[in-house]
């Protein structure tokens, strides 16, 4: 901490340190007030396949202002419907950032150094004990796309491996993938290629971060960061073993 303060002091002197402190204090106060508001107020809701779900709201990564607001809500509802003794795998260490530490699950993430995370590649992960349920929040689009050597087709291998080698008989997998980010994934969808047995789509419809379930034709060609920040359309994919 002292090293950070000393570094800031060298950059701009005592006044700069004071301004930096005020900026951090203001940001933290605003975050705390927003968190309190989330706890004390009732969230609006949206519909997913006839089920009314509350928008998820959280400060981390501005979840209240982007696609996380529906992704986490959909995944939370998915998990609530599972048997209590279900073996669960999360692809990508996401939920732990939003306070879901009480959900017993394994977490597979090739790059996350957290001690509870399995650091293996999703394309080759082959556990002895298979999982009754697998879920992933905005992670698959990065597989093969945001790696040192780009391999767009790796996402296909990942989905195939998860369903063939990780999912138990009668198991179910649910993933959320933003449209407009991984153009290979988008192209495959437009050609009718099916990664998932079931596909559902959401479109962001307002600057207030409201979302609506729509048909694919309504989100085909959706852009990332246009017209709103982050995802403007989402694909919810489901596979039953």
Where are these regions (language model features)?
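Class I SAM-dependent methyltransferase Rossmann-like catalytic core
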Residues: 18-83
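Short, flexible/disordered intra-domain loops and linkers
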Residues: 59-65, 144-156, 184-191
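Conserved class I S-adenosyl-L-methionine
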Residues: 83-95, 147, 173-201
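Adenosine-cofactor binding site in Rossmann-like domains, unifying the SAM/SAH pocket
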Residues: 99-128, 133-136, 154-158
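A conserved beta-strand element that flanks and buttresses the S-adenosyl-L-methionine
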Residues: 135-140, 144
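A short glycine-rich, Lys/Arg-flanked "PGG" loop and its adjoining helix->strand segment in the class I
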Residues: 151-172
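Class I S-adenosyl-L-methionine
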Residues: 191-241
């Amino acid at each position: 901490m002292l090293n950070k303060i000393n570094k800031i002091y060298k950059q701009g002197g005592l006044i700069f340190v004071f301004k930096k402190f005020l900026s951090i204090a203001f940001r933290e106060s605003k975050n705390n007030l927003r968190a309190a508001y989330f706890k004390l107020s009732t969230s609006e809701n949206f519909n997913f396949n006839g089920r009314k779900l509350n928008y998820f709201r959280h400060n981390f990564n501005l979840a209240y202002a982007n696609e996380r607001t529906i992704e986490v809500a959909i995944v939370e509802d998915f998990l609530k419907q599972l048997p209590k003794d279900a073996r669960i795998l999360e692809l990508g260490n996401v939920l732990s950032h939003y306070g879901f530490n009480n959900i017993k699950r394994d977490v597979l993430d090739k790059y996350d150094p957290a001690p509870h995370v399995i650091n293996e590649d999703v394309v080759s992960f082959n556990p002895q004990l298979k999982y009754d349920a697998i879920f992933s929040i905005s992670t698959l689009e990065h597989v093969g796309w945001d790696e040192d050597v780009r391999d767009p087709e790796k996402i296909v291998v990942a989905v195939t491996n998860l369903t063939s080698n990780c999912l138990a008989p009668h198991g179910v997998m649910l993933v959320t993938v933003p449209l407009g980010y991984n153009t290979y994934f988008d192209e495959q969808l437009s050609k009718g290629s099916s990664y998932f047995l079931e596909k559902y789509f959401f479109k962001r419809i307002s600057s207030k971060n409201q979302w609506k379930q729509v048909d694919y034709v309504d989100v085909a060609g959706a852009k990332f960061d246009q017209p709103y920040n982050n995802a403007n359309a989402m694909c919810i994919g489901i596979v039953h073993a």
